């Protein structure tokens, strides 16, 4: 069952004071709230410690109304010696709704130094679903990662190297103990050497747990009469953990080669360019987005299951992350075509609708994420007869993939060099530099990092033996304007129907594994028509001869477990040579091929996974907090099949 998220509540007492069962009485005085937050900044020594750093990461147990984040952001903005990129990771079991957060921080309007930041936070506030939510401010230089869920669980799943901790002291039936021994052990797991902390808790049990896990502890008195602040740093006397927190890949220059200019590759280009990398993008076709990313439109939605399995959590994270990135592109002037009326996923049977209802009830998601429609509601929404109800995703829909790619390349600006009509025959490595080489042996580009985003050809270029991709032929059909009834929004089920801006209806698509024939087939059009006529009776009217219909053939490359391949590629040769020692290995134990990453195997979900995959790779390269929980990072790890072979002693 999923970890159902319960929001904090807010009420106003008779004396006008805002109170919350989860947080008690909320601050009324902006200056006092700011002073309280600034004590935490001073206690962790931030202004001195983030000077000249590329990135600096703060982890907070308990976000509340965001006061400490807003004060930290203001201090960062005011400091000319600040770090280049500030990461703030906050755990919150009971986040406020957007409107309650607006009310809760209303007292900050009087503090002009942070009121603008508060407005930006409220505008970016994410949907109330569990997991990690990444928000960017100040052109991406301030990054807030909100971990919605229980503190102990979320910290154990967090992949980060923390430079400082703000330790809340909220202990209630609603929050549990946010400074339990388990929580403190999880903090020690992600602490960088010398990481500092500050807390208002003076519980001796907390002090003991901190000292037992490698933190020092001392009290700092406050001259203004406030209670003493407990501070310290991570300075273990002996090695206390099996795996060290992630570090940035050491490179002589922030340069990368990305091979493949579809959804996966263009997303990587944009995310690396945003961090100051220079990229050579190599595409074998004359234009970007020429394979599956060249379809007129693609549907975009998350999956939902009652048990909230890996696929559900991954697609939810990808869906929300893509929405945030696309809004950022549009705000920066790089708009592209996408529908804005939501999307309906119709059930294929009564049993299928029951499964949808169970998944909907289990997650308890808000209506801005998903709504359940019975048959009558679905019929009214679509103004068409339907056999069953389904799920309405108000922010789902259809997107023009090539437009997304073009927007991402435009956002990268001068940091990307495109080599179109260029095919990479092989990769060569000389010390710390990768070279992309053509069939004649000429060097096309060189860099310390290569990201393979070229779908089916990635396995060949990387020489992988333990990642298998399968091509799946997909033929879509275009129905001419006037041949169908109006369809208010994209609709999917067994097949899909997408209204395009010019009145054309896009329907599809066939699913033909191991078929690599690019020829358009009449039988494919017939199959697509039959599916959509069953899905939406009454949608399709009289048609011209099927042989005259237009369409497109493209190929999705899928992995056996239907989960993408994202992250650093394993050094398979070294792993095989040490197979016996690695038979019980975890993903973090496996040797990696330095500087070689993969972003492929996206199948039919490139729109959902591409932006998230790009952010994951960029974060891994930079040693930043990852945008996914550990279990999900492991699920997309390119080495997962090698790990299974090692554990099954199929190697060696």
Swiss-Prot record:
FAD-dependent cmnm(5)s(2)U34 oxidoreductase: region residues: 259-652
A cellular component annotation (GO) from this entry: cytoplasm
Reactions listed under catalytic activity: 5-aminomethyl-2-thiouridine(34) in tRNA + S-adenosyl-L-methionine = 5-methylaminomethyl-2-thiouridine(34) in tRNA + S-adenosyl-L-homocysteine + H(+)
Region of interest called tRNA (mnm(5)s(2)U34)-methyltransferase, as start-end residue ranges on this chain: 1-235
EC number: 2.1.1.61, 1.5.-.-
Subcellular location: Cytoplasm
Entry annotated with the keyword tRNA processing: yes
GO biological process assignments: methylation; tRNA wobble base modification
InterPro entries: FAD-dep_OxRdtase, FAD/NAD-bd_sf, MnmC-like_methylTransf, SAM-dependent_MTases_sf, tRNA_MAMT_biosynth_bifunc_MnmC, tRNA_S-uridine_synth_MnmC_C
Main localization, broad class: cytoplasm
Cofactor(s) needed by this chain: FAD
Top-rank taxon: Bacteria
GO MF annotations, alphabetized: flavin adenine dinucleotide binding; oxidoreductase activity, acting on the CH-NH group of donors; tRNA (5-methylaminomethyl-2-thiouridylate)(34)-methyltransferase activity
UniProt entry keywords in alphabetical sequence: Cytoplasm, FAD, Flavoprotein, Methyltransferase, Multifunctional enzyme, Oxidoreductase, S-adenosyl-L-methionine, Transferase, tRNA processing
Similarity-based family: In the N-terminal section; belongs to the methyltransferase superfamily. tRNA (mnm(5)s(2)U34)-methyltransferase family.
General function of this protein: Catalyzes the last two steps in the biosynthesis of 5-methylaminomethyl-2-thiouridine (mnm(5)s(2)U) at the wobble position (U34) in tRNA. Catalyzes the FAD-dependent demodification of cmnm(5)s(2)U34 to nm(5)s(2)U34, followed by the transfer of a methyl group from S-adenosyl-L-methionine to nm(5)s(2)U34, to form mnm(5)s(2)U34.
Protein name: tRNA 5-methylaminomethyl-2-thiouridine biosynthesis bifunctional protein MnmC
Organism of origin: Burkholderia ambifaria (strain ATCC BAA-244 / DSM 16087 / CCUG 44356 / LMG 19182 / AMMD)
The gene coding this protein: mnmC
């Amino acid at each position: 069952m999923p970890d159902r998220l319960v929001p904090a509540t807010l009420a106003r007492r008779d004396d006008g004071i805002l109170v919350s069962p989860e947080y008690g009485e909320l601050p009324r005085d902006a200056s006092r709230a700011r002073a309280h937050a600034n004590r935490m900044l001073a206690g962790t020594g931030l202004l001195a410690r983030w000077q000249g750093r590329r990135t600096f990461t703060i982890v907070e147990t308990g976000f509340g109304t965001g006061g400490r984040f807003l004060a930290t952001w203001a201090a960062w903005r005011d400091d000319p010696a600040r770090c280049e990129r500030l990461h703030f990771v906050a755990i919150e079991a009971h986040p406020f709704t957007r409107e309650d957060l607006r009310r809760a921080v209303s007292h900050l309007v009087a503090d002009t130094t942070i009121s603008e930041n508060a407005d930006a936070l409220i505008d970016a506030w994410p949907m109330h679903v569990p997991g990690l939510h990444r928000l960017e401010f100040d052109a991406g230089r301030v990054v807030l990662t909100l971990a919605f869920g229980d503190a102990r669980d979320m910290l154990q799943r967090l992949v980060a190297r923390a430079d400082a901790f703000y330790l809340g002291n909220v202990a209630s039936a609603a929050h549990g103990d946010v400074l339990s021994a388990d929580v403190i052990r999880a903090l020690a797991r992600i602490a960088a050497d010398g990481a500092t902390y500050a807390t208002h808790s003076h519980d001796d049990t907390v002090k003991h747990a901190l000292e037992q896990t490698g933190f020092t502890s001392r009290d700092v008195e406050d001259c203004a009469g406030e209670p003493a602040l407990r501070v310290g740093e991570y300075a273990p006397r002996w090695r206390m953990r099996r795996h060290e927190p992630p570090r940035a890949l050491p490179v002589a220059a922030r340069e990368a080669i990305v091979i493949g200019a579809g959804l996966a590759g263009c997303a990587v280009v944009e995310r690396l360019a945003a961090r100051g990398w220079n990229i050579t993008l190599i595409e074998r076709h004359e234009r970007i987005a020429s394979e599956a990313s060249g379809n007129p439109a693609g549907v975009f939605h998350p999956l939902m299951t009652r048990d909230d399995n890996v696929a559900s959590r991954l697609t939810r994270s990808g869906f929300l992350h893509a929405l945030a990135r696309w809004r950022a592109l549009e705000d920066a002037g790089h708009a592209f075509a996408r529908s804005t009326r939501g999307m309906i996923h119709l059930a294929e049977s009564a049993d299928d609708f029951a499964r949808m209802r169970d998944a909907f009830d289990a997650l308890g998601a808000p209506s801005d994420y998903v709504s359940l429609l019975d048959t009558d509601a679905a019929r009214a929404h679509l103004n068409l007869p339907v056999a069953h109800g389904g799920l309405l995703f108000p922010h789902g829909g259809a997107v023009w993939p090539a437009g997304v790619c073009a927007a991402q390349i435009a956002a990268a600006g001068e940091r990307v060099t495109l080599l179109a009509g260029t095919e990479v025959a092989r990769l060569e490595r000389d010390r710390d530099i990768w070279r992309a080489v053509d069939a004649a042996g000429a060097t096309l580009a060189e860099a310390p990092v290569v990201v393979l985003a070229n779908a089916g050809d990635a396995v060949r270029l990387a020489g992988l033996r333990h990642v298998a991709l399968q091509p799946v032929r997909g033929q879509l059909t275009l129905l001419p304007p006037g041949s169908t009834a109006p369809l208010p929004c994209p609709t999917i089920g067994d097949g899909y129907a997408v209204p395009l801006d010019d009145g054309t209806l896009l329907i599809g698509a066939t699913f033909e594994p191991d078929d690599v024939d690019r020829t358009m087939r009449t039988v494919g059009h017939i199959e697509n028509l039959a599916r959509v006529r069953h899905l939406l009776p009454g949608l399709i009217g009289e048609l011209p001869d099927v042989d005259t219909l237009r369409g497109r053939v493209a190929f999705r490359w899928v992995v056996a477990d239907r989960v993408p391949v994202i992250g650093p590629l394993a050094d398979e040769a070294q792993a095989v040579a040490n197979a016996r020692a690695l038979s019980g290995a975890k993903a973090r134990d496996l040797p990696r091929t330095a500087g070689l990453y993969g972003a492929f195997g996206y199948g039919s979900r490139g729109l959902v996974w591409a932006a998230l995959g790009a952010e994951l790779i960029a974060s891994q390269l930079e040693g930043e907090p990852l945008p996914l929980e550990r279990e999900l990072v492991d699920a997309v790890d390119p080495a997962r099949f090698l790990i299974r072979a090692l554990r099954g002693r199929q190697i060696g």
